Every structure is written in structure tokens, then in C-alpha cells.
């Protein structure tokens, strides 16, 4: 299989959760420019499913109303539940308790396109909890649709352009992220000085490969939240040992990759359009959690 283009990012299978926006390119005026919001763990595969129809895993709402373009995707969610909650709120802004404070989201403005309306909803969502605390990436997949947000988004979020490729290959992961030397862990937490039990589950370290920071996950979270009383999920901060700037989402992603990928998910590069795994049809009802 040829390597991905230089502007194409590589995400590791089992660690990618995205919420995407489709726009119809149908020649039928009833469907052209209509939009659809969905969840995926594999963007390339998902758009193929939508364009091939229900029999190949596409959604009922998109069947025979395309062809569709996946114009943007939001990713960086810590898990599929968080992404599904985001998807549901983006689909249902009038029902989401977090978005009811924005009465202007109840309907499209006069002459506003379906894309502009969905983009306006997204802009509002990125500024409210719990999503404004997440280190999300807003990725443009089609340059024709790129535009700036009217309202500023949190500075720890990233806006990028280019496709994303999902790979189960350990070789590709190492090529994309670099092969780091084995971590020399301490047996005690550097912050509370207590022994770290069940280290595979509760231990975190620094992203600086030369730093030997070893902490309980909760201890490091509390340390990084020192200047933010009342919050539960840190955004980032300085390493208590080497003062490297840390991103909480990057720490968790690094830990997941250190735990490895299940054997059944490795080295399987063939696409199966009839089975999209954890991807969920947007007709599924998702309960919105309260703070």
C-alpha cells in the first residue's frame, strides 16, 4: 500500500473518534447542499459507506441523496461516548441543555445555507462546557468550504487542513510519531511519594522522552488543575520536573499508545465497507450527561 500524502495525518486505529459534517453534491435540487452530522472511527471508510448506500453501512438519511462530501471533521475526543454526545448536540441544538442558552440556534437565518447554519452551531458548541475544555482538532477536509469562525475558539484547540488516515500498522505509527526509547519509570509517585499500584492503569509520565516524571494520574491531574478551582479535567500545564509544557489530551493519548493495540487490530490494512465497527447511525438516541 502506498504511503499517505504528505498533508495527510495518520491516526492509530482504536484511538480516533470523530464527528463529521457531510454536504450533498446531488444534482437533485431537493437534496443539494443539505447537510448531515455523524460519528466515525474511520473517515475514509465512512464517506464511502454513505455514498454506496444503506446496504453498505451508510445511513438512511443519506441514502440516495448524494453524492456526499465529508467537508470537515472534529476529532481529539477522549472516548466514543464524548464524541457521540457532541454529535447528538450538533444534530439537536434545540434539545441540548448546553445549547438552549443560544436561542439564535433554533432555526436557520434567512438566506443562510445548511452548511453555514451547521457551522454556526459548531462555533457555539466549541465555546461551552464540557467541550471547551477538550483539546479538539477542527480539521477541514475540503478547502472550498474553509472559513474562519465568527466567535473565537479556545486557544488550546487546533484548526488544520488535510485528510486523515486510520492505520492499524505498528510500523506506520512509529514512522508517524517516531520511535521513543523505553520509559524508565519510578516505583513511587513524584508528587505524593506513595507507591503506584496497578501502574498500567494509574501511571502517567512526561511527554519529554528524557524526563523521568512518574505520577499517579489523579495526582498529576490535581497538580495541573492547581490554578483552576472547580474544574475536573485539566487542559495542560508545566511538568513538575522538567517544566516541559504538557497537554492533558496528549498525555492520555501517549498512555493509550503505550498500552498497545489489541493483536486482532494490527496489520489489517484491508477495508471492509460492510462493517464499520463502532460507527453509529445518527438515528441512535444518545443521552446527554450533565456536569
Swiss-Prot record:
Catalytic subunit of a heterodimeric structure-specific endonuclease that resolves DNA secondary structures generated during DNA repair and recombination. Has endonuclease activity towards branched DNA substrates, introducing single-strand cuts in duplex DNA close to junctions with ss-DNA. Residues 264-291 have a biased composition (Acidic residues). Forms a heterodimer with mus312/SLX4. Its main location: nucleus. GO terms for biological process: double-strand break repair via homologous recombination. This is Structure-specific endonuclease subunit SLX1 homolog. Its cofactor is a divalent metal cation. InterPro entries: GIY-YIG_endonuc, GIY-YIG_endonuc_sf, Slx1, SLX1_C, SLX1_endonuclease, Znf_RING/FYVE/PHD. Pfam families: GIY-YIG (PF01541), SLX1_C (PF21202). Belongs to the SLX1 family. It is an enzyme of class 3 (hydrolase). Residues 261-291 are annotated as: Disordered. Residues 15-101 form the GIY-YIG domain. The keyword Nucleus applies. A zinc finger (SLX1-type) spans 189-242. The gene is slx1. The keyword Nuclease applies. Its EC number is 3.1.-.-. One of its GO terms (cellular component) is Slx1-Slx4 complex. Keywords: DNA damage, DNA recombination, DNA repair, Endonuclease, Hydrolase, Metal-binding, Nuclease, Nucleus, Zinc, Zinc-finger. CDD domains: GIY-YIG_SLX1. GO terms for molecular function: 5'-flap endonuclease activity; crossover junction DNA endonuclease activity; zinc ion binding. It comes from the Eukaryota. It is found in: Nucleus.
Amino acid at each position: 500500500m502506498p504511503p499517505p500524502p504528505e498533508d495527510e495525518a495518520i491516526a492509530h486505529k482504536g484511538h480516533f473518534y470523530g464527528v463529521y459534517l457531510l454536504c450533498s453534491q446531488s444534482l437533485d435540487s431537493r437534496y443539494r447542499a443539505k447537510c448531515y452530522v455523524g460519528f466515525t472511527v474511520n473517515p475514509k471508510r465512512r464517506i464511502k459507506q454513505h455514498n454506496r448506500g444503506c446496504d453498505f453501512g451508510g445511513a438512511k438519511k443519506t441514502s440516495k441523496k448524494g453524492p456526499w462530501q465529508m467537508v470537515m471533521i472534529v476529532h481529539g475526543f477522549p472516548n466514543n461516548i464524548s464524541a457521540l454526545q457532541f454529535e447528538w448536540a450538533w444534530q439537536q441544538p434545540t434539545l441540548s441543555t448546553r445549547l438552549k442558552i443560544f436561542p439564535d440556534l433554533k432555526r436557520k437565518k434567512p438566506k443562510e445555507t445548511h452548511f453555514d447554519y451547521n457551522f454556526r452551531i459548531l462555533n457555539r458548541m466549541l465555546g461551552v462546557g464540557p467541550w471547551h475544555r477538550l483539546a479538539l482538532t477542527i480539521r477541514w477536509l475540503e478547502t472550498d468550504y474553509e472559513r474562519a469562525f465568527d466567535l473565537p475558539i479556545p486557544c488550546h484547540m487546533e484548526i488544520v487542513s488535510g485528510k486523515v488516515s486510520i492505520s492499524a500498522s505498528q510500523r506506520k505509527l512509529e514512522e508517524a510519531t517516531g520511535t521513543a526509547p523505553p520509559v524508565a519509570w519510578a516505583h513511587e509517585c513524584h508528587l505524593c511519594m506513595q507507591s503506584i499500584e496497578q501502574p498500567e492503569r494509574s501511571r502517567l509520565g512526561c511527554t519529554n522522552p528524557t524526563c523521568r516524571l512518574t505520577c499517579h494520574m489523579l495526582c498529576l491531574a490535581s497538580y495541573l488543575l492547581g490554578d483552576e478551582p472547580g474544574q475536573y479535567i485539566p487542559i495542560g500545564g508545566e511538568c513538575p520536573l522538567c517544566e516541559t509544557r504538557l497537554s492533558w489530551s496528549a498525555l492520555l493519548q501517549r498512555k493509550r499508545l503505550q498500552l498497545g493495540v489489541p493483536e486482532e487490530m494490527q496489520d489489517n490494512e484491508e477495508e471492509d465497507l460492510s462493517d464499520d465497527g463502532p460507527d453509529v447511525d445518527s438515528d441512535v438516541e444518545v443521552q446527554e450527561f450533565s456536569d
